[in-house]
Amino acid sequence: QAYLHLQGLKPFERPLIVGTELVSLSAVMSCRRAGIRPVAMLERNARATARWPLSLFPRLCGVPMHFSSELLEIEGRGRVEAARVRLGDGRVERIACDGILLSGRFVPESSLVRLSHLELDPASGGPRIDQFGRCSDPAYFAAGNLLRPIETAGWSFREGRRIAGLLAADLRAELPSAAPGIAIDCSGPLKLCVPQRLLADPTPGLAHLQLRVSEAASGRLRILADGRPVWERALSCLPERRLLVPLAALRLPPDTRRLEVAFLTSGH
C-alpha cells in the first residue's frame, strides 16, 4: 500500500497472492487500481477465508483461485521469476510471476511482550489475560489486535474502550485481586481462546470467551468446569470467524479450578 499510494511505485506487475482473507481482497483491489494483474491466489484451506459473497470478488476480476494449495518454493535471481505450488489435487505446478504477496496467517505484534516478563500465549501469539484484560503482571492491561491476529477496527475500538474502563476501575480498587484463576484448556480444531484464564467473580469484565478455529468445522462446542458440563451448543465455524461464548451463561462455581473447551466435530 505504501509503495502504491505514498510513493507511486509498482513493486511488481504479475504477483501471486497467498491468502484469501479480507486484506487479500483489498490487495486485489489495490492491484487493479494500479494496473497490476495478479496471476493467481492461493488458499491452504478448502474454501476462502473471507465471507461469501466477498470471496467472489477475485474471480470477477479474472484472478484464478486455488484452494487446498500451498506455496512450496520461490524461484528467481535478483527478483522473483516464478513460484512452485502444490495444488489441491496433489500436482506441483510452476506459476510464472514477478512477486509474492503474503496476505494471510497474521500474528499479533507482540515483540514487547516477548521481551518482557509477561506470559505469552503460544496459541494466540499475544499476552495471557484474565477477563479484566490484566496480564500475568496485573499492572499491565492489553486489548485489541495485541491479543489475537486479525480483529476488526470496530471490535478492537470497543474492546479497548471496555478495557480502559476496567483499568480505571482497577485504579479505584474496584476489581477483584489478581490471582492465578481458572486455567482454560482448548481441544479439537480450536485455534485460540481469549481470555486465557478466568476468575470466578461476578464483577463484570469482558463479556465473552472469544474462540477461533483453525479449519472449517461442524459439531458441538462443549465447556466443562472441573469435568462437569456447564455449556454446550451446536455450531458450524470457519477460520478467522469470531466465536463468542457468553461468560455469564457459564455460571462457574467459585471453587472451579479448570475449564475445558472442546469442539466435538461431527462423527465424534
How should each PLM-predicted stretch be described?
Residues 25, 32-114, 119, 205-236:
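A Rossmann-like FAD-binding core segment of flavoenzymes
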